[in-house]
């Protein structure tokens, strides 16, 4: 289904393994949405892209052909305010839209940045929906590729991320979790913190590449 190449955590779709399969990549929240936009910009073929967000402005700017605003009634088109409970409730509010978008999938990849509101709270809901699409056969393979906060973001945000990760593990077949601190090993030591955060805005180590 997927391979890891020499870049840790990076997924490469192998043509011989996914031929004929209907693959959907779902970016949840800001970080996940950025990852999807980057994959599209890189020219990745053979998959369907979906962006899910509470933030209507960010959603409109996303490159994904399928955009799902969740929690419109709850957040009024704004973000989840770094509150995973709001993100979860938003996704639950629009479960039917998510289910419709994922229908017919053979494989579902979910990408998100954990620690904030929408990605942390909504990603497990999306994963749960995807995992149930196969019914009793469980035929839909569901994989989550997520990033964890920088340690300097504090214990609260990391705690939220770990809670979200635990919830994801209950719903998916496999999880790849990439600590953002690892990004510091791939950029110059004198890189400003602001630049490190810019790099982390796209889960680069979770980038999917075509055959």
Regions inferred by a protein language model and the residue ranges of each:
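Tubulin/FtsZ superfamily GTPase core signature
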Residues: 1-211
């Amino acid at each position: 289904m997927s391979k890891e190449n020499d870049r840790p955590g990076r997924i490469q779709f192998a043509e011989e393994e996914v031929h004929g399969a209907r693959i959907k990549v779902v970016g949840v929240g800001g970080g996940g949405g950025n990852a999807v936009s980057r994959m599209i910009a890189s020219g990745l073929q053979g998959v369907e892209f979906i962006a899910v967000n509470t933030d209507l402005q960010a959603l409109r700017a996303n490159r994904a052909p399928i955009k799902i605003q969740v929690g419109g009634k709850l957040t009024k088109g704004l973000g989840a305010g770094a509150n995973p409970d709001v993100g979860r409730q938003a996704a639950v509010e629009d479960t039917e839209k998510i289910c419709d978008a994922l229908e017919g999938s053979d494989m579902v990849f979910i990408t998100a940045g954990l620690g904030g509101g929408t990605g942390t709270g909504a990603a497990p809901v999306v994963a749960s929906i995807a995992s149930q699409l196969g019914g009793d056969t469980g035929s839909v393979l569901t994989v989550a590729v997520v990033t964890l906060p920088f340690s300097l973001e504090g214990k609260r945000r990391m705690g939220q991320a770990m809670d979200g990760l635990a919830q994801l593990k209950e719903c998916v077949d496999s999880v790849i979790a990439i600590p953002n601190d690892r990004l510091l090993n791939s950029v110059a030591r004198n890189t400003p913190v602001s630049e490190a955060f810019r790099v982390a805005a796209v889960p680069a180590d979770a980038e999917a590449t075509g055959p």
